[in-house]
């Protein structure tokens, strides 16, 4: 693909998300989502591989369905209330339809069926964009309308996502599918807490993007797409392999890594809201995700080949262009937990 075309598509991605961020009208917000979808579709299919074509087709059909449902719900809301404002969602029929449409856009369970299959057919860089940037626009709409949405529906969606995200990753051998189910589980935490604390939901989104970016970039450095290939990477890129292992543990929420911070604060907030049963279920579902991350790290650590450093040096790769951003993201992923009191003070 031409660099000029790639630049135009990436600019369109930024434009679509910005339009959704700044719009107060449902029609403009829908337009921003459509620009996002149309911009990422050529980026997904640029390899001309059958799996990439299949993944792009699945993604496009799913996003088109979600967009159609969202447009119908907003038109119905405008017809019944006479309001196009995104903050006005008083129609009883439109609110659940918009919830389902945004859940389908993001990949929240039980509308998650497309996400693992689509990510599996994409290269890691495009998968990174799909797992992080493409979540921003629909999450913004969910953020703006959360006060109008049904609390029970949001709770069921969030709890289902955390459980399915944990169970779905248990029997996977492909790293991209593992990261897809990790994304589903993290979205469940955001959907749960957005009803009670919007600032916590934003913090969770920010840390999720940071940790997921670190995981994807380290896997790109390692050129790894399967779990069993991680065990052979110690000889070529030992530092990146160690970073990948710690980033995966951070995604699982293991202290003292950064991933523990949002789970800690969310469970604390749910307890303050007098929801101890929900907090307990969320904590137990987080153990499912942590288990398959620990299994991956077990595979990586117990199969280190007994080579001396002299044998390993000649095979090590030189640092690439991703070294500096990866280093900065890694520091945030691994060492931000001590800043939790500062984060809480800023949010309050």
From Swiss-Prot:
Subcellular locations according to the entry:
Mitochondrion inner membrane
Q: What is its main location?
A: mitochondrion
Q: Which InterPro entries match?
A: Complex_I_Subunit_2 (IPR050175), NADH_DH_su2_C (IPR010933), NADH_UbQ_OxRdtase_chain2 (IPR003917), ND/Mrp_TM (IPR001750)
Q: Does the keyword tRNA processing apply?
A: no
Provide the catalytic activity annotation: a ubiquinone + NADH + 5 H(+)(in) = a ubiquinol + NAD(+) + 4 H(+)(out)
Cellular component GO terms, alphabetical? mitochondrial inner membrane
EC annotation? 7.1.1.2
List all membrane-crossing ranges: 1-21, 25-45, 60-80, 93-115, 149-169, 177-197, 200-220, 239-259, 274-294, 326-346
Do the record's keywords include Amino-acid biosynthesis? Answer: no
Q: Write down the membrane topology.
A: Multi-pass membrane protein
Q: Which GO molecular function entries does the Swiss-Prot or TrEMBL record give?
A: NADH dehydrogenase (ubiquinone) activity
Q: Which UniProt keywords apply?
A: Electron transport, Membrane, Mitochondrion, Mitochondrion inner membrane, NAD, Respiratory chain, Translocase, Transmembrane, Transmembrane helix, Transport, Ubiquinone
Q: Which GO BP annotation is one of this protein's?
A: mitochondrial electron transport, NADH to ubiquinone
- Please give the family membership noted in the entry: Belongs to the complex I subunit 2 family.
Its biological purpose is as follows: Core subunit of the mitochondrial membrane respiratory chain NADH dehydrogenase (Complex I) that is believed to belong to the minimal assembly required for catalysis. Complex I functions in the transfer of electrons from NADH to the respiratory chain. The immediate electron acceptor for the enzyme is believed to be ubiquinone.
What's the protein name? Answer: NADH-ubiquinone oxidoreductase chain 2
**Biological source species:** Latimeria chalumnae (Coelacanth)
Source taxonomy: Eukaryota, Metazoa, Chordata, Craniata, Vertebrata
- This chain is encoded by the gene named MT-ND2
């Amino acid at each position: 693909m031409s660099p000029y075309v790639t630049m135009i598509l990436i600019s369109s991605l930024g434009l679509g998300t910005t339009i959704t961020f700044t719009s107060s009208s449902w029609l403009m917000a829908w337009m921003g989502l459509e620009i996002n979808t149309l911009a990422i579709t050529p980026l997904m299919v640029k390899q001309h591989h059958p799996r990439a074509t299949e993944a792009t087709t699945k993604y496009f059909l799913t996003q088109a369905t979600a967009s159609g449902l969202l447009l119908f719900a907003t038109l119905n809301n405008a017809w019944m209330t006479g309001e196009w404002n995104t903050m006005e969602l008083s129609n009883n029929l439109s609110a659940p339809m918009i919830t389902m449409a945004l859940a389908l856009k993001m990949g929240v369970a039980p509308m998650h069926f497309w996400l693992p299959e689509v990510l599996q057919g994409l290269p890691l860089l495009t998968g990174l964009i799909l797992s992080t940037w493409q979540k921003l626009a629909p999450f913004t709409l969910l953020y703006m309308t959360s006060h109008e949405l049904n609390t029970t529906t949001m709770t069921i969606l969030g709890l289902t996502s955390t459980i399915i995200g944990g169970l779905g990753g248990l029997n996977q051998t492909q790293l991209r599918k593992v990261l897809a189910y990790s994304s589903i589980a993290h979205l469940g935490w955001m959907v749960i807490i957005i009803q009670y604390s919007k600032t916590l939901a934003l913090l969770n989104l920010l840390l999720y993007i940071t940790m997921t970016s670190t995981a994807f970039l380290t896997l790109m450095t390692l050129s790894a797409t399967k779990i069993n290939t991680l065990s052979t990477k110690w000889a070529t890129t030992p530092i990146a392999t160690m970073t990948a292992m710690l980033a995966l543990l951070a995604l699982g929420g293991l202290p003292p890594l950064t991933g523990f911070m949002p789970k800690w604060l969310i469970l604390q907030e749910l307890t303050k809201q007098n929801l101890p049963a929900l907090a307990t279920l969320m904590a137990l579902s987080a153990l499912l995700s942590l288990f398959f991350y620990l299994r991956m790290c077990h595979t990586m650590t117990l199969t280190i080949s007994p080579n001396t450093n002299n044998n390993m040096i000649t095979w090590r790769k030189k640092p690439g262009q991703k070294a500096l951003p990866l280093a900065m993201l890694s520091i945030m992923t691994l060492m931000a937990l001590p800043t939790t009191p500062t984060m809480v003070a800023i949010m309050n």
